Amino acid sequence: MMNRFRKWLYKPKRSDPQLLARFYYADEELNQVAAELDSLDGRKDPQRCTLLVSQFRSCQDNVLNIINQIMDECIPQDRAPRDFCVKFPEEIRHDNLAGQLWFGAECLAAGSIIMNRELESMAMRPLAKELTRSLEDVRGALRDQALRDLNTYTEKMREALRHFDVLFAEFELSYVSAMVPVKSPREYYVQQEVIVLFCETVERALDFGYLTQDMIDDYEPALMFSIPRLAIVCGLVVYADGPLNLDRKVEDMSELFRPFHTLLRKIRDLLQTLTEEELHTLERNLCISQDVEFPIRADVQGPAALAPALSAPLPPEGPLSAKAKDPDAELACSMQYDDQELEQLSRMVHRAGDEMSSLLSPPIACQSPAHRPGAEGSPGGEASPGRPRLRSGSDEEERVFFMDDVEGTAEALARPESPAGPFGWAGSTWADPQEKGQGGPGGAAGISLPASEKEEDLSNNNLEAEGTDGASLAGTSSCSCLDSRLHLDGWEVGADDAETAEMIAHRTGGMKLSATVIFNPKSPTSLDSAVATQEAASEPVAEGMDGGPHKLSTGATNCLLHSCVCCGSCGDSREDVVERLREKCSPGGVIGASYAAGLAKASDRAPERQEEAPPPSEDASNGREPKAPTSDKCLPHTSGSQVDTASGLQGEAGVAGQQEPEARELHAGSPSAHEAPQALSGSSSSTAGSCSSDKMGPEAAPAATHAAPQATREKIRSRFHGSHDLIHRLFVCISGVADQLQTNYASDLRSILKTLFEVMATKPETDDKEKLRKVTQTLRSAALEDCALCQETLSSSELAAKTRDGDFEDPPEWVPDEACGFCTACKAPFTVIRRKHHCRSCGKIFCSRCSSHSAPLPRYGQVKPVRVCTHCYMFHVTPFYSDKAGL
């Protein structure tokens, strides 16, 4: 009864501007909405329930904002520190955050659990309960004080506010940290490095003319796409020691680029092969906001291995020629991703994926022996005990665009599964060459082709070969991602392996395809590829001299010739092949470090394998070379270690002394030996291996080291059909990475670009300052001579300091009504209709038209807007026209 009487007697007015009075009515409104929400059945009237919940959240925001103002006024020196708020993302820091935290605390205190945050919810529940209790105590103390004295803050109320402020700050940090990632100081430092990289990129783009200063000053929307793309290029090749330094640990990279570490490494290797003009062409294409085409430049010649492929156009019936002639296949990633462009890009990517699948598996019309049943008499058709099988599962790695789909299969096929082969090659791989060569027409090693079909197949693939040796020679460029056990006399691979390749090709769509098509899988750097073996020259000669029916089908030959499209198996020129054979087969050759553990097992089996091979002199006299164990021509590296071939293994086991004379005899004596390198150099797909310096003789090491960069560059570039193809695929991959940042890291990228625009925007020059000073002087001349405020010399900062200290000035004296019969500004006489109005700023009398503005006057203690004249509003109230308040 006493409280009701006190409430009726001391209840503050609704129009009272004091904080306690405003809190009282805001709290009353919150209680009313809460009571109505409790009494409402949400199932009967869901719309009304939704409306009340929204209103309830709004009332909570209002109450907390007023409490925050009271704490600023009551305990300004005792506020809990909130420096951690700078680590919150921009979308979190808004005015409604306090209300959301209150709502979340009540839900947690009631027993609710944040979705996918069970552990964090259980850890925060005690704090949430304590926070809600403290908030109720604060509300009760403020309500009670509002009914007593609006101008007094008791010590009890101050203590309640301090306790609540500490709890609320602690809960804010815990709740936001559980919901969104909060950066550490190290991550902020790395992000600042990225900002510096972006600024340097824009500075370089301005110097080269890629961008204009007007685009930056106008905040051109296309820059949201152009700048990240250019930053990737600059970070990889121009400022290689910056935040995109791939030689550092992955953990030290910015979280923006950390998921793309593998892809960025391969992009960097390709960027390093570009000429300066090609780099400028790529950067210009990355800046434009329309579909781009990559013309073939006449001044930049492709590598020697690509000369025949570029000179002769592909026929329309070839699978790759259809891709090259299709304009959609050359569609570049545009910066403006509207629905139509996304649909076109999706169609193009899936079409390329279908073509990829056709490359990975032979055409149905020309079914290869790999898809034939194993009952046709071929030794490879049966499942040998040593045949490697695909493993059901592989180690989970950080995959970018699912690039490892293909390389995972290659690794699984290369892993040892039985003691029969220490390196995963066993069974029919080591079979007697005579057994393979005398299979007869009925063998399933391959199908013979008429001469016309052979010539047509060779011409379709731009292969310069003579006679019938070209069809069998095409098999020398087989690669691991297509078939781990391809032989020149047939495809000895199980149906499971081929089906797995088809499944991988079917999955390889979207940006996954671009990463798989362009780069050699599982290669630490594109400079280190696979190592060519002696079979590159020896086996084609054997097949050519044999003249047997063991020829690849048209589909198989077509697939093998273009195997570089799917795994990057590329080749050397004629001289490189012969030189590599000499260096590779030297007596001083050693095996790679990654396979050192297998040497012990291999050496135990070396005598048996040596007996299987016929003597080299006998084979040389017959025009045939001994069959070395068939191995992958483009076996990918793992963990940066060198991968040796089976011929190198045999040389280490004791046959290396015989291999060097054989290689030289092959080069000097046999006519077919000259055809093999020539055909290899003319094909668009040849071996991309590189011999490391430790496998060469001492006299050849310095020269090879000197020529290594240029040779490696040519090997990498030979994987592409030309400069335009390389630039186009780099454009697609770089755009894919940069545009992913817009989706995955929108907040960080927005913060980086915001800082970038603040730094790179045009600063006001001296001339602009002079113009501003002249305008200010002109406006000052319009000041009234009889205005006391215009004659003051106090600056705005001094007035602000006086206002902050609470030293309010006395309002000006009003001019008496009877002393003025005209408007001070327009001199219009006052009538019954045109009434008098006093300006609260200067105290003079004006008509309603000349005093139509309202503004607060903090220097006089007026917090709410009051009537002021036009002159005071323009020159004394708002700071837009002068740097002094006392004009």
Curated annotation (Swiss-Prot):
Residue numbers binding Zn(2+) 1: C823, C826, C847, C850
Residues the entry annotates as binding Zn(2+) 2: C839, C842, C869, C872
Residue numbers bearing the Phosphothreonine modification: T516, T870
InterPro entries: FYVE_LST2, LST-2, Znf_FYVE, Znf_FYVE-rel, Znf_FYVE_PHD, Znf_RING/FYVE/PHD
Biased composition (Low complexity): 681-693, 700-711
Zinc finger (FYVE-type): 817-879
GO molecular function, one term: phosphatidylinositol-3-phosphate binding
Keyword Ubl conjugation among record annotations: yes
Feature: compositional bias, Polar residues: 638-648
UniProt crosslink position (Glycyl lysine isopeptide (Lys-Gly) (interchain with G-Cter in ubiquitin)): K87
PTM statement from Swiss-Prot or TrEMBL: Monoubiquitination at Lys-87 prevents binding to phosphatidylinositol 3-phosphate (PI3P) and localization to early endosome membranes.
Main subcellular location: cytoplasm
Region (Disordered): 308-327, 354-396, 412-474, 599-714
Modified residues (Phosphoserine): S334, S586
Keyword Transcription regulation belongs to the record: no
Bias type Basic and acidic residues, positions: 602-612
Cellular localisation: Cytoplasm, Cytosol; Early endosome membrane
Gene Ontology process terms (BP): negative regulation of epidermal growth factor receptor signaling pathway; negative regulation of epidermal growth factor-activated receptor activity
Family: Belongs to the lst-2 family.
Comment text on domains: The FYVE-type zinc finger mediates the interaction with phosphatidylinositol 3-phosphate (PI3P) and localization to early endosome membranes when not monoubiquitinated at Lys-87.
Purpose of the protein: Negative regulator of epidermal growth factor receptor (EGFR) signaling. Acts by promoting EGFR degradation in endosomes when not monoubiquitinated.
Subunit text: Interacts with TRIM3.
Protein name, UniProt field: Lateral signaling target protein 2 homolog
Source organism per UniProt: Homo sapiens
Encoding gene (name): ZFYVE28
